[in-house]
Amino acid sequence: MSTAVNVPSAVRPADKRPIASFHPSPWGDYFLKYVPCDQVTQAKMEDEVKKVEEDVKKELRKLAKAVGKPLELLNFIDVVERLGVGYRLEQEIEDLVQAIFDNDKFGVDEFDLYHTSLWFRLLRQHGFHVSCDVFGKFKGRNGRFKDSLASDVKGILGLYEASHVRTHGDDTLDEALVFTTTHLKAVVTNQPNHPLVPQVTHALMQPYHKGMPRLESRHFIAFYEKDPYHDKTLLKFGKLDFNLVQALHKKELKDLSRWWKDLDMHAKMPFPSRDRVPEGYFWTLGPFYEPQFALCRKFFLQVFKVTSIVDDIYDAYGTIDELTAFTKAAERWDRSCLDELPEYMKVSYASLIDTFEEFERDLAPQGRSWSVKYAREEMIQMCRVYYQEAKWCHEKYSPTCDEYLEKASIVSFGYNLGTVVCFLGMGDVATKEAFEWARGNPKVVRAAGIIGRLMDDIGSHHFEQGRDHVPSAVECYIRQHGVDEVTAQRELGKRVESSWKDINEMMLKPYMMPKPLLTRILNECRIVDVIYKGEDSYTFSNTTMKKNISHILTDPIPI
C-alpha cells in the first residue's frame, strides 16, 4: 500500500511558507463553562419524555388500525420524523411505511398534490423505489406541470421537497424542481404575507432532504408551533426530546473542549491554525445526533480536530522538505519517527498516534480494536494525498479538473477517512466486510467525496487563491475548458447534483450495506450541504456557522 515519496525539483523556494490567516473561534471557552443539570433534574426530564413517547406510540398504533385515514397517518409519520424524534419510534415507523408500500388500496391515486408528494418522499426516503409517474395526473396535455397548481402553495412546497430525492432517470422530478422553484420564488416575492412564506423561504435555501437532520428539526419545531392545527402532544414530544438531547450534546462538547484544551495543540503550532472545536462538534452532529451514538461522536470529533491540524500543516505552513518527512513518518506510523521531524510537527504526529491508540482502548471492551487499523490506513492515505497537493502547489502545476478530482482532491476532503471513522463506533453492524467495502472507495463514497470537494472549492476558492495554494476545482475547470468563473461554478454544480442522485440511489432497497451505515454517508453529505452552501462557514465561522450552532447548542426550547 505504501508509495514512494520523492522530493520534487524546486520551483518555489523550499523554505517559503504559504501561511494562511484564520480568525479565532467566536465561542472561546463558552462550552467549557457549561454546567450540566443534576441527576434528579436529568431523571425527571427523561421520565417526562418517556411518558409523552408512550402517548405518541398509542396514537400511532390507533392511526395504523384506522380505516380510511391514510392522510392522517402520512402526516403523523412526517411530523414525527421532522420533529427529530423518529429515532425513538424507528421500528414502528419502518413497519408502517412497509405496510403503506404493500397496500395497493392506500389511495394515492386520489391524493392531492401535497399528499401525493408526501407519500412519494416518505417512501423514497425509506428505501422504496416508487415511480415518479405518480405525478403524471398533475400534468397537462403538453406534458408539463399545470400552471393552475401555482395557487396550491402547500402542494407546490411538498412537490419541491419531493423533487430532491430524485435519482438518475427521474426526468419528472428534474422538471418538478424547476417548476416548483420558480413558483415558490414568486410566492415569496408576490405574497409576502402568505402564512407559508417563512417555511418556503427556508426550503428554498435549504431543502429538507439535503439538510442537517438536527438543525432541520430545530427549524421545523418553530414552524410547526405556528401551525394552528398542530398536534400539541407531538409538539411537546419534539420540544422535550430536543432539550434532553441538547443537554447531552452540551455535556459531550464540554468534555471534548476540555480534551482539546489540555492538548493545547493550537498554542503549540507556530502558525494560526483553525481552532474550531464547537464548529467541529457541530459537523459531528451531522452524521449522528442521536443519543446512542456518543462514542461515534467522540471518535469523529477527535479525528476531525487532529486531522484539521495536519491539513493546515500541509496546506498553510509546512515547507516541501518538512512535508516529505512528515509523509514518510505517517507511512511508517511509529513513534521512532519523531526524531526525524521538526518540533512543531512532532506535536501533531504524536497526537495522531495517541488518538488512534485511544480508539483501540475505547473499543477493546467490545472486542473491536481490530477496526481501528482501517481508519489508520485511511489517515495515512490522506497524508499521501495532502502531499500530492502540496507538490502540485510547490511545482506550480495546474492539473485538469478531472485529474484534480481523480488523483487527490476527493480523498483530501476527508470522506474516505470520515466514512471509516463513522463506522468505528457503530458496533457489530460495522463488520469487517463493511470496512473493506468502505476502504475500496465504492461509487457512493466517491459521490460523497465529489459533493464535499466541489462545494468546499466553490465556497472557498477566492480565499484559498489569495496565497500559494493548489488550484481549486473552479480554477482547474476554468483553465481546462476556457470558461469564466460563473460558468465553471454552474457546471461543477451540475456534477454535485449528479452525485446527489448517486447518493439517493444508494439509499434505495436492496441496500448494498446495512442501512445504519449508509445513513452515515447520506448525513455526511447533508452536513456538507449546510456548511459549504455559498461559503466556507467552517473556516469563516463567525457568521452562518455561529448562528447554526446557537440554534442547536445554546438555549433550550421553551416548553
UniProtKB/Swiss-Prot annotation:
Gene3D superfamilies: Farnesyl Diphosphate Synthase, Terpene synthase, N-terminal domain. Mg(2+) 1 binds at residues 311, 315. The Asp-Asp-Xaa-Xaa-Asp/Glu (DDXXD/E) motif is important for the catalytic activity, presumably through binding to Mg(2+). It comes from Persicaria hydropiper. One of its GO terms (biological process) is diterpenoid biosynthetic process. Pathway: Secondary metabolite biosynthesis; terpenoid biosynthesis. GO terms for molecular function: magnesium ion binding; terpene synthase activity. A motif (DDXXD motif) lies at residues 311-315. Mg(2+) 2 binds at residues 311, 315. This is (-)-drimenol synthase. Its EC number is 4.2.3.194. Belongs to the terpene synthase family. It catalyses: (2E,6E)-farnesyl diphosphate + H2O = (5S,9S,10S)-drim-7-en-11-ol + diphosphate. Catalyzes the conversion of (2E,6E)-farnesyl diphosphate (FPP) into drimenol, a precursor of the sesquiterpenoid polygodial. Polygodial has been shown to be an antifeedant for a number of herbivorous insects. Keywords: Lyase, Magnesium, Metal-binding. InterPro entries: Isoprenoid_synthase_dom_sf, Terpene_cyclase-like_1_C, Terpene_cyclase_plant_C1, Terpene_synth_N, Terpene_synth_N_sf, Terpene_synthase-like, Terpene_synthase_metal-bd, Terpenoid_cyclase/PrenylTrfase. It is an enzyme of class 4 (lyase). Mg(2+) 3 binds at residues 456, 460, 464.
